[in-house]
Amino acid sequence: MEIQNDRKAAIKKLRLLTYNSKSNIDSFRQKMEETFRTVFLPNSVERSEYKYGNVDCDILAPEIYSSNRIMIYIHGGCFSGGSRKVYRAFCSSLATKCYCRVVIPEFRLSPAYPCPAAIEDIQAVFRALFTEEQISASLNTEKGTTPKLPEIIIAADGSGATIACALLYNLRERYRSCISHVVLFSPWLDLSPTSKIMSAKKISDEIMSGDVYKKSATDYTYLENTKIPSVSPLLADDEQLKHFPPTFIQMGEKEILLDDAKDFAARLKENGNECELDVWKGMMFMFQMADEFLHESHLALDKVGKVVTQDSAGQESVEIENKPKLEHSLRSEA
């Protein structure tokens, strides 16, 4: 009975992440912030503020992190909601599990700022962060040795995954090569009129619906734009998918988004890329953000941490001198 009640409480909480035709935009944003914001960050994570590319960002630094590993987290919220405050607790847990700093940009939201405003903001953040991390790596490199490339992770959930893919599709190879992992939670991958989700009648999803998709897409951009890869990543051509960074997709078994994720993972693999689809039995959309109710939330983030850090662990045994320096951080130095 207690487990069943916890599940109901988790579903009630997670539904506040979705925006549908019956929602009021101001109420949607307010309820999300009231529910998910926190005064104290978990695991002694320290927060500082910084502008990357003139975009306000949070930088979350755990007690121990790899000095050349940094994550850009592109939050969900149906393109119309979400903020640094909403995602601080969740991203603090990610920072701890992945031994890295996490940057949360406060990008512009629809409908006041439709596509491509959010994409442009994230591109500006990425360019500025990439440049600063390169400079930092050069300054910390011993004379006569080659500077290490920064290890950048792109992570996102829901509608944020749409924006993340738009960023990746438009990056030059020199930038893509510095992205060690792409981590997508319950990604939105096809907002086009032909999307199976748009036309779904009976669904088992306890959080998401076709109505959420339609309303979010309508506020985000024009109907014609939903047919392009920057808005519907699943529609990318093979050329855009080539040399895509190693990708980890995590989601629940009961999600309406699962079929699109399976198709996307298959296409990435067909184009010679690494992709793991991690599906959690009985779980729902963004179950990772209901950790006070679902034990699976903690286990899922543990797995993300192992995926992100496994390559570095492999390097330790082969080339000790290339092991990322671990440092204690009292505050972010970005």
Residue ranges, per PLM feature:
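Serine-hydrolase catalytic core
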Residues: 225-281, 299
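Short strand-loop-helix active-site module centered on a catalytic nucleophile
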Residues: 57, 72, 94, 115-191, ...
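Short beta-strand-to-loop junctions in surface cap/lid or active-site-entrance loops
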Residues: 56-67, 236-241
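C-terminal catalytic histidine-bearing segment of alpha/beta-hydrolase fold enzymes
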Residues: 263-265, 269-330, 334
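Hydrolase active-site cap/lid region
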Residues: 169-227
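A glycine/proline-hinged amphipathic helix-loop "lid/cap" segment
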Residues: 1-63, 313-334
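Short amphipathic alpha-helix adjacent to the substrate-entry channel of hydrolases
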Residues: 85-104
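Short beta-strand element of the alpha/beta-hydrolase
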Residues: 68-77
